[in-house]
Swiss-Prot record:
Transmembrane segments: none annotated. This is Small ribosomal subunit protein bS16. It comes from Mycoplasma mycoides subsp. mycoides SC (strain CCUG 32753 / NCTC 10114 / PG1). Residues 96-108 have a biased composition (Basic residues). It holds the Pfam family Ribosomal_S16. Keywords: Ribonucleoprotein, Ribosomal protein. GO terms for molecular function: structural constituent of ribosome. GO terms for cellular component: cytoplasm; small ribosomal subunit. Belongs to the bacterial ribosomal protein bS16 family. The gene is rpsP.
Length: 108
């Protein structure tokens, strides 16, 4: 399973995290598939590439609890929810077009 999670970098007593897409079986600071953002907890600074994150979430990547809260604060989960369910409501609102054959009157 592919997960969106934090990868710790930085010094002792000065944590800094990368938000990465990684296989769930790989250790925390191991290889990752793609870098989608960064998080600095000391300054409470979050930088996330919205398009990449939405791409991975649409493809089935599961965020960890911490990353989920960061995504919701950035409004990315709301955008994901709206994109998924706005398609369903649009198709439900469309009425099926019935193909009725009309008889043409012949006036001679």
């Amino acid at each position: 399973m592919v997960k969106l999670r934090l990868k710790r970098i930085g010094k002792k007593q000065a944590p800094f995290y990368r938000i990465v897409v990684a296989d769930s079986r790989v250790n925390r600071n191991g290889q990752y598939i793609e870098l989608v953002g960064t998080f600095n907890p000391l300054k409470d600074e979050v930088k996330i590439d919205n398009e990449l994150t939405l791409k991975w979430l649409n493809n089935g990547a599961q965020p960890t609890d911490t990353v989920r809260s960061l995504l919701s604060k950035q409004g990315i989960l709301k955008a994901l929810h709206e994109s998924k369910f706005s398609k369903n409501t649009q198709t439900e609102n469309k009425k099926p077009v019935s193909k009725k054959t009309t008889k043409k009157s012949k006036d001679n």
